[in-house]
């Protein structure tokens, strides 16, 4: 009896199990870096640590020709488009590159590009979206982006910003569309596997598959498509709102620059953020009373829901943004 194709629940359980172990590896590597180099270096290099963790996980499993922990958990194996052979080393290498490395590279290029295009070209200050010193203009990618966007006109910057936004949001929507399509047809769960033609076969035979599960997944796929349409509309609306708010902010900042030099000197003496060790911008207070940059503390709380100084636990929604605070 020929091996049967893996069912959608098996593929999803394998992916969820892999995500669980990848998350544990990322957390352990990030914790080691934080303990050895401190919070500042952890914030600066956390994306690279996550990339190395993912490459290590898939390099020791997929690239080496073994099952991942998730695939072993549900007893499924990868096969090439012929459905009779294990994928070649080259095909597995392309799979790991598309699944783990390419998203990092796109984020590394598109995010600094959007931040530099959103920044005021007439101002010497770095963009507000940066989080840490390595992201505030010190990285090679940011310097390259800044050098090539410095000569653009305002109209060209707006057009390029729209293109970068459409590309980044379009990739996210494509991923959601692909998952919804999987719920309906149940073949490729990850976009990288579709591009490489890698599918799954069962290693062991199971009792007859419940047809109600198939129907439920198809219904979930339809709901996911409707949710995708709604989220695309909300993202476009939010982008237009941000564009309008950015214009108002630039007008307000242009008026504020006309104030006297005394106030300029007072602003320049703002205290430092203890996370990035730079002038504190958009001050935000934790429930325990410590102050940080809004960008720094929100990035910190995305992985550690505690104060970086006193280690008091608190949920991220308890952060207090201080308006007009000096």
Swiss-Prot record:
GO BP term (any one): protein import into peroxisome matrix
Pathway as given in its UniProt record: Protein modification; protein ubiquitination
Stated role: E3 ubiquitin-protein ligase component of a retrotranslocation channel required for peroxisome organization by mediating export of the PEX5 receptor from peroxisomes to the cytosol, thereby promoting PEX5 recycling. The retrotranslocation channel is composed of PEX2, PEX10 and PEX12; each subunit contributing transmembrane segments that coassemble into an open channel that specifically allows the passage of PEX5 through the peroxisomal membrane. PEX10 also regulates PEX5 recycling by acting as a E3 ubiquitin-protein ligase.
GO cellular component, one term: peroxisomal membrane
Assembly and interaction partners: Component of the PEX2-PEX10-PEX12 retrotranslocation channel, composed of PEX2, PEX10 and PEX12. Interacts with PEX19.
Cross-referenced InterPro entries: PEX2/10, Pex_N, Znf_RING, Znf_RING/FYVE/PHD, Znf_RING_CS
Chain positions of all zinc fingers (RING-type): 273-311
EC number(s) stated in the UniProt entry for this protein: 2.3.2.27
Regulation (activators, inhibitors): The E3 ubiquitin-protein ligase activity is stimulated by PEX12.
Localization of this protein: Peroxisome membrane
SMART domains from the UniProt entry: RING
Protein name: Peroxisome biogenesis factor 10
Notes concerning its domains: The three subunits of the retrotranslocation channel (PEX2, PEX10 and PEX12) coassemble in the membrane into a channel with an open 10 Angstrom pore. The RING-type zinc-fingers that catalyze PEX5 receptor ubiquitination are positioned above the pore on the cytosolic side of the complex.
Primary localization class, coarse: membrane
List of residues binding Zn(2+) 1: 273, 276, 293, 296
Membrane topology: Multi-pass membrane protein
Reaction equations catalysed: S-ubiquitinyl-[E2 ubiquitin-conjugating enzyme]-L-cysteine + [acceptor protein]-L-lysine = [E2 ubiquitin-conjugating enzyme]-L-cysteine + N(6)-ubiquitinyl-[acceptor protein]-L-lysine
Residue spans, topological domain Peroxisomal matrix: 1-7, 61-89, 186-216
């Amino acid at each position: 009896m020929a091996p049967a194709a893996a069912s959608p629940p098996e593929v999803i359980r394998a992916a969820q199990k892999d995500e669980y172990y990848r998350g544990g590896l990322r957390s352990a590597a990030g914790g080691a870096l934080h303990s050895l180099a401190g919070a500042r270096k952890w914030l600066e290099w956390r994306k690279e640590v996550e990339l190395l963790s993912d490459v290590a996980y898939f390099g020791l499993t997929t690239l080496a020709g073994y099952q991942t922990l998730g695939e072993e958990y549900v007893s499924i194996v990868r096969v090439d488009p012929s459905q009779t052979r294990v994928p070649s080393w080259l095909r597995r290498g392309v799979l790991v590159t598309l699944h783990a490395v390419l998203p990092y590279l796109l984020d590394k290029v598109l995010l600094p590009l959007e931040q530099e295009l959103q920044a005021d070209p007439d101002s010497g200050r770095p963009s507000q979206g940066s989080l840490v010193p390595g992201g505030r203009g010190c990285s090679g990618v940011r310097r390259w982006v800044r050098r090539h966007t410095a000569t653009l006109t305002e109209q060209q910057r707006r057009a390029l910003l729209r293109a970068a936004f459409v590309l980044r949001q379009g990739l996210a929507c494509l991923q959601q569309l692909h998952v919804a399509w999987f719920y309906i047809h149940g073949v490729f769960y990850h976009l990288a596997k579709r591009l490489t033609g890698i599918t799954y076969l069962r290693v062991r035979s199971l009792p007859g598959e419940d047809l109600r599960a198939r129907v439920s997944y198809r219904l979930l796929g339809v709901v996911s498509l409707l949710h995708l349409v709604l989220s695309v509309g909300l993202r476009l609306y939010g982008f237009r709102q941000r564009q309008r708010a950015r214009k108002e902010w630039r007008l307000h900042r242009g008026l504020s620059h006309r104030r006297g030099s005394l106030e300029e000197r007072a602003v320049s003496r703002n205290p430092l953020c203890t996370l990035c060790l730079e002038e504190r911008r958009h001050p935000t207070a934790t429930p325990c009373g410590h102050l940080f940059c809004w960008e720094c503390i929100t990035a910190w709380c995305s992985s550690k829901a505690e104060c970086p100084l006193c280690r008091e636990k608190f949920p991220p929604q308890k952060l207090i943004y201080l308006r007009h605070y000096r």
